[in-house]
Structures are given as C-alpha cells and as structure tokens.
Regions:
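Membrane-embedded transmembrane alpha-helical bundles that form the catalytic cores
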Residues: 1-402, 406, 410, 414-452
C-alpha cells in the first residue's frame, strides 16, 4: 500500500476511528482485516504468498517449541529458512537465470521474510516463547504501517504491544506523518525529476549535472525512505504502537561506521544479529573480521536487488569500512574535536556515501562508472548556468520551503510547542495537502523507492 495513494489517505482515518471505538479485545481483528485489505489493494496477487509464509513460520515456531531433540528443532528451523529465503530468492532473483519467466516481485517480501525468519530463529535460540494465537501472529507479520518497507521489527518489541489492552494514542503520530509526507511529496519527488533526467542519459551529462544529480539523489533516497518510515512510525503511534526508528540523521555521521549506525537501522541490526555475529563477528581475528564484514555488505547489496550494481554498492561500502577501520587508530576513540577536524570528517563521510550512491542509482555498473568519469567534464560557466536553470524555479522553491519547515519542526511533540514550530507545522501540513492534490490532478504519484526491494 502506497501511503500517498488515495485509498490509504481516505481509509486510514476510518480505521483509526474504528480502532479506538472497539473494545481492546477486538482491535486485533480490525487491524488484521485492515492490514490484509490495504495489502490486497496494492498487491492482490501476492496475498496467498504472504499467507503461506505466515502459516509456515507460525507452524515452524510451534514445532520448535514442541520438539524434544535438537535435531528436530534444527529441522523445523531449516524448513522455515528454506520457506522464507527460498520464496525471496524465487521471486527476487529467478530472473537472473530465467528471463523468459517473468515473476512480479511481491510487495514487502524482502521485509516480511526477514521479520518472520528472525522470529523463528529467536524461538530456536530460546529467547522467547512462540506466539500461539494465529490472529496476533498474522497481525505481527502483516501490520500495515510497516509491512511493505519496514522497519523490520523484532517479535519481542512488536507482539507485546499488539497484545496490550491499555494502548494509548500517541498524538506525536500526526507530527511524524506530516513530516514523512513532506519529505516524500515536497522533497524526494521534486529531487527525482532532475535526478531521473541525468541518470536516463549518462553519456550526455556534464560534470555540473552529475555532481548536482549525485547530491540530489543522496537527498532523494533519504527523504523518500525516511519519509516512508516517518509515516509508518506516525500511523502506528496513532494506533498506540511504537515502531523502531529507522533513521537517525545519517548525513550527520562523521565516519562510515557511524553512518551505518544511523542508516536503515533495523536492517543493519538484522544483519548484525543474524549474519555477522553468527559468522564470528570480530572475535576471530582480523582476516575473519574482514571476510564477515564483506559478506554482510555484499548480502546487503544483494538484498536490495538482483543486479550487479547493487552488489558493487554493498562491496564498496564494505571495502571502505574496512579501510577506514585499518587507518583509524584505536577504533576512532581519540578523534580530534577541533572545528576543522569535525568538518573534514563529515565531508569525507558524506563524499564517500555519495560516490557509492552513484552505483546504487545507476542502471548498471558501466553507467555508474561513466557518470563518475564525466564529473570533470565541461565545467564552463555557461554549462554551470544551464544546469542550474534546468532545475527550474518552482522545484527549487519547493525544496527550500520544505527543508526550512522540516528544520523548524520539533523532533517530537514531548516538549511544549513554540509558536514558530506550530506555524511551521501548519504551513507544512497545508503545503503537503496542496502537493498531494497536485499529484492526483497531474497523475504523477511516485511509489516509494524501497517498494521495489
């Protein structure tokens, strides 16, 4: 379900009102019905697969809990892993080998397969007891705010909240949702117009155009993905459920290691807990640490898509992270804190992240290398002037207005709002509504980037 689609915008307030009108013991029925309904609107053909993985992992978890021997438990775990990873590989990567058999990628499959698999693994490790109520487990898998693009929630965090009878609406959800819609409609979709034009024709791009497109895409993917996460967090908060925060100002990072603590936090934690640490983490020497790091980042790239340029993006991050670790004494514990040193670290981190984004956004590795090779090309004043004019006055105004209002918004609604923040919220909300109606009128609604993963 696309959060900017009319169906969600019109039906979510109805679901919200009904949710708080129902007795607590019946709310799960409404939420499960709404979750499956929202999913069916966007991907009706994928509903049986979602149901199959839900039933399969539910049975596997119960099987592990009932098994008396370790062999039987491993068999149940293996069945769940084959089900989740097998379905993910079939629908996401089968096209690499059989281009004559087109398979539509089910919405959210990369997210809910990881979420259900981590649940079964935690049962196997003895960290929690299985959820025996099939309805609550189905809701855990399909909870609509985070089903399609995360955050990837742990059962220990989400299931108790779904069971809770005394949930309360968190009004900060409105703030989160307005912020998320603003990031998507005012910033991400606006930046996408110029970015798409440059990446569509890399051979014709000038140096200024490549640089500007690279910077704008860094903003676009952050605004787009964090915008979705903000809407998800906000919608869940209004339903009395607290989701994990997926982003923590990643472009404020002063190292690549710091960047990955702040970017797509739920996925980073998943790979850390279920791949990196089981492989040995950093406990088995330098060589093993390097191998484990590269495995995690290559898998992360592959998770994003069945294309070489995604794998290269992951490999670039893994290699740069290892190089940074090797060149940083004492793990970076003794950093210089002068203004110049701090600025240099931020600039270095942002520059490397932006270079890696070129591989992520380009249609192929060759296109990415071509775009990077054109960075030094044609930096004349006339080309620079033409590039800036090609963006247009209206998009620039939307970017500036949206960014300014977002900056003035408070992080949360816990503190007493200032007149400035109230004005920013009202202005941003009105602008978002206008932008939403504009997209409906022009038919230019863009899906969130991470829907394709």
């Amino acid at each position: 379900m696309n959060f900017t689609a009319p169906a969600f915008v019109l039906l979510f307030p109805i679901v919200l009102a009904l949710h708080w009108m129902l007795p607590p013991s019946r709310r799960w029925v409404l939420l499960l019905t709404a979750s499956l309904g929202f999913y069916a609107v966007g991907s009706p053909q994928a509903l049986p697969l979602l149901a199959g993985i839900t039933l399969g992992t539910y049975a596997a978890a119960l099987g592990i809990a009932k098994s008396k021997t370790q062999t039987a438990k491993k068999l149940w775990l293996t069945c769940a892993a084959v089900l989740c990873i097998g379905c993910l590989c079939l629908f996401k990567y089968a096209g690499i080998f059989r281009t004559d058999v087109p398979l539509l990628l089910p919405a959210g499959i990369s997210f809910y397969t990881f979420q259900t698999l981590s649940y079964v693994i935690d049962i196997y490790r003895g960290r929690l007891m299985p959820e025996r109520h099939p309805g609550y487990y189905a809701l855990f898998v399909s909870f609509f705010p985070q089903l399609v693009a995360g955050p990837i929630e742990r059962s220990t965090a989400l299931l108790p909240q779904l069971h809770a009878q005394e949930r309360r609406m968190d009004s900060s959800g409105w703030l989160w949702m307005v912020r998320g819609f603003a990031k998507k409609l005012l910033l991400a979709d606006t930046a996408a117009v110029f970015v798409d034009s440059v990446y569509a024709s890399p051979t014709d791009a000038s140096g200024p155009a490549v640089l500007l497109a690279t910077l704008l895409f860094a903003g676009q993917i952050y605004w787009d993905f964090s915008g979705y996460s903000d809407i998800a967090v906000g919608a869940a908060a209004l339903l009395g459920v607290r989701l994990s925060r997926n982003f923590d100002h990643p472009y404020r990072a002063d190292s690549l290691r710091d960047f990955w603590r702040r970017w797509h936090i739920s996925l980073t934690r998943w790979f850390t807990d279920y791949v990196y640490i089981p492989l040995g983490g950093s406990r088995r020497g330098t060589v093993r640490l390097a191998v484990n790091t590269m495995v995690v980042f290559l898998l992360s790239g592959l998770w994003h898509g069945a294309a070489l340029h995604f794998v290269v993006w992951g490999g670039v991050h893994g290699a740069l992270l290892l190089l940074e670790k090797a060149l940083t004494p004492c793990g970076g514990k003794h950093k210089a804190h002068t203004w110049t040193a701090v600025c240099l670290r931020h600039a270095y981190t942002f520059s490397l992240v932006c270079i890696a984004w070129v591989f992520f956004r380009a249609a192929s590795v060759s296109d990415a290398l071509l775009l990077l090779s054109r960075l030094p090309v044609d930096w004349s004043l006339s080309t620079l002037h033409t590039t800036l004019l090609s963006i247009g006055i209206q998009p620039v105004a939307e970017l500036v207005l949206g960014a300014l209002c977002l900056h003035l918004l408070p992080e949360t609604s816990s503190a007493a709002p200032s007149p400035r923040s109230v004005l920013a919220f009202c202005l941003l909300a009105l602008t978002v509504v206008a932008a939403w109606f504009s997209t409906l009128h022009t038919g230019t609604t863009n899906a969130f980037i991470y829907f394709q993963f």
